[in-house]
Swiss-Prot record:
Annotated family: Belongs to the heat shock protein 70 family.
Entries under Pfam families matching the protein: HSP70 (PF00012)
Stretch list, region Disordered: 622-645
Primary gene name: HSP70
Alphabetical GO biological process terms: chaperone cofactor-dependent protein refolding; protein refolding
Keyword Secreted attached: no
Transmembrane segments: none
Name of this chain's protein: Heat shock 70 kDa protein
GO molecular function, one term: ATP binding
Length: 645
């Protein structure tokens, strides 16, 4: 590990909550934030004066719904026109627009309109997680392992990596969330198990859902198959409840709250709380005072109703499980352990669906909120050479989607089938489609459909300079190469001429350019400086406020008041009252103004207090809130001291 870079950390960048861990003293430490919470909301908010991230952003969301963003993970690496983005936008109070089919989030910040890409919002959450770790470890952190849903496609992975760069992190590795959870499970069980184990990780979080089937043996974690839905999670269960209660409010009060972001936000928060309560009780009451136009809303909600509202989504959770078993060519009876990860797996109905495994006991020994960060921290320690005795751990992950290229007639020709272990490299020879064809267009796709138009285009490039020849004669070798981060390089070579061309799939359509990333890194620095400026301002304001109120209390103290001449007391009272009323009307003043006001107030109060103490004989110590370096009393007050050469 390079000196001065601090330890490497593992970050679970979640849709709704994020978590950070570090390998220390031979174990993983999940780090609590400044509020004492071990998970931090993935929320970012902008107000008229400052930027808020984490708990502070989530706590003010009801007052400021349109300038608070959450769920950036549901936008990252996606196109604005995609159905998933369009359907989510209807539920978000913040404004979004498409810039060349890239979703942008619009905020009002300090009276100006600002646009941010999802990568920037995610980078702000990553910065927050980095700062939480730095505060705990007392050193600067540069290296991190960041997790993504196993079913994230190439562009979503690239965009997550970009977010890390903007946050000033060196993302050593992007690993899949269920694989990270499997590491946590594997280390937890290491002492008690021997032989090969087939483990199914069922990871249902706030916004994404993954299922992975792994074989674990002697520190080797081999992913056999993975499946999932990058747009299914706890948020969707909340949405169903919100929609249900919007209708109920309409029915009871003949009023529609769906156009009021603040009312909707308060309802969503209450629904989220109710959902959690219903995991441990059969019914609960939602209480919201003055939800809309002064009307209180206190509906009852039962677990049965919650399950009915979401039954189709719960059933949907089983499809990837079945697909995963099919792909791995494994029978459900061969699964030794089913591990639940993600907060949404606490829902009793989700746990019941596991009856699919014929009543197999579910493994709940690992914390579903922290398992992913735990595994990422272990991987970070291995990659940076810290977790020495863990270096016998080997991860064999897979690519979640088939990769191939378009051949004549729009057909998808697969070179790397889904669930192929990575890193991997595959070659195939292609030829021209017509006589004397001077070049070929290589179009790279990912997806499972037979025709390329139904799959996702990752990128394309041209191989030109092919000598004239009848169709089918030229031999063009196409190579697909996937690295450990699941990032794809494609190259094509004409065997006769040695002519070569290649592309690293960076999904140019939605990917940020180097220049844009540079600009965003600078912006991140700027926002950080602004955040520090705000903190300085708050500290200076608080110092002035404390001093003024301390001084007011000091002169109200009978012991002190009796020793102060009336005119001095009046002088202090006037100065303190003046400072407090100035504070009330100048909350947004600059640091210098607060400091000047403080000096002015000290200049009036300190000499009077010092004179009073000095008048009593040798100084008896300063009054409450008085500065050590206050000017000494006036002439004749107390003993004179001469300077000795």
């Amino acid at each position: 590990m390079a000196k001065g870079e601090g330890p490497a950390i593992g970050i679970d960048l979640g849709t709704t909550y994020s978590c950070v861990g570090v390998w220390q003293h031979d174990r993983v430490e999940i780090i609590a934030n400044d509020q004492g919470n071990r998970t931090t909301p993935s929320y970012v908010a902008f107000t008229d004066t400052e930027r808020l991230i984490g708990d502070a952003a989530k706590n003010q969301v009801a007052m400021n719904p349109t300038n608070t963003v959450f769920d950036a993970k549901r936008l990252i690496g996606r196109r604005f026109s995609s159905p998933a983005v369009q359907s989510s936008m209807k539920l978000w109070p913040s404004r979004h627009l498409g810039l060349g089919d890239k979703p942008m989030i619009v905020f009002n910040y300090k009276g100006e309109e600002k646009q941010f890409a999802a990568e920037e919002i995610s980078s702000m959450v990553l910065i927050k997680m980095k700062e939480i770790a730095e505060a705990y470890l007392g050193s600067t952190i540069k290296n991190a392992v960041v997790t993504v849903p196993a079913y994230f496609n190439d562009s979503q992975r690239q965009a997550t990596k970009d977010a890390g760069v903007i946050a000033g992190l060196n993302v050593m590795r992007i690993i899949n969330e269920p694989t990270a959870a499997a590491i946590a499970y594997g280390l937890d069980k290491k002492a008690t198990s021997s032989g090969e184990k087939n483990v199914l990780i069922f990871d249902l979080g706030g916004g994404t859902f993954d299922v992975s089937l792994l074989t674990i043996e002697e520190g080797i974690f081999e992913v056999k198959a993975t499946a999932g839905d990058t747009h299914l999670g706890g948020e969707d269960f909340d949405n169903r409840m919100v929609n249900h209660f919007v209708q109920e409010f309409k029915r009871k009060n003949k009023k529609d709250i769906s156009g009021n972001p603040r009312a909707l936000r308060r309802l969503r928060t209450a629904c989220e709380r109710a959902k959690r309560t219903l995991s441990s009780t059969a019914q609960t009451t939602i209480e919201i005072d003055s939800l809309f136009e002064g009307i209180d809303f206190t509906p009852r909600s039962s677990r049965a109703r919650f399950e009915e509202l979401n039954m189709d989504l719960f059933r949907k959770c089983m499809e990837p499980v079945e697909k995963c078993l099919r792909d791995a060519k494994m029978d459900k009876s061969s699964v030794h352990d089913v591990v639940l990860v993600g907060g949404s797996t606490r829902i009793p109905k989700v746990q019941q669906l596991q009856d699919f495994f014929n009543g197999k006991e579910l493994c709940k020994s690992i914390n579903p909120d922290e398992a992913v960060a735990y595994g990422a921290a272990v991987q970070a320690a291995i990659l940076s050479g810290e977790g020495n005795e863990r270096s016998d751990l080997l991860l064999l992950d897979v690519t979640p989607l088939s990769l191939g290229l378009e051949t004549a007639g729009g057909v998808m020709t697969v070179l790397i089938p889904r669930n192929t272990t990575i890193p991997t490299k595959k070659e195939q020879v292609f030829s021209t489609y017509s006589d004397n064809q001077p070049g070929v267009l290589i179009q790279v796709y990912e997806g499972e459909r037979a025709r390329t138009k139904d799959n996702n285009l990752l990128g394309k490039f041209e191989l030109s300079g092919i000598p004239p020849a009848p169709r089918g004669v030229p031999q063009i070798t196409v190579t697909f190469d996937i690295d450990v981060n699941n990032i794809l390089n494609v190259s094509a070579e004409d065997k006769t001429t040695g002519q070569k061309n290649k592309i690293t799939i960076t999904n140019d359509k939605g990917r940020l350019s180097k220049e844009e990333i540079e600009k965003m890194v600078q912006e991140a620095e700027k926002y950080k400086a602004e955040d520090e400026e705000v903190k300085k301002k708050v500290d200076a304001k608080n110092a002035l406020e404390n001093y003024a109120y301390n001084m007011r209390n000091t002169i109200k103290d009978d012991k002190i008041a009796s020793k102060l001449p009336a005119e001095d007391k009046k002088k202090i009272e006037d100065a303190v009252d003046g400072a407090i009323s100035w504070l009330d009307s100048n909350q947004l003043a600059e640091v210098e103004e607060f400091e000047d006001k403080m000096k002015e107030l000290e200049g009036i109060c300190n000499p009077i207090i010092a004179k009073m103490y000095x008048g009593e004989g040798a100084g008896m110590g300063a009054a409450a809130g008085m500065d050590e370096d206050a000017p000494s009393g006036g002439s004749g007050a107390g003993p004179k001291i001469e300077e000795v050469d």
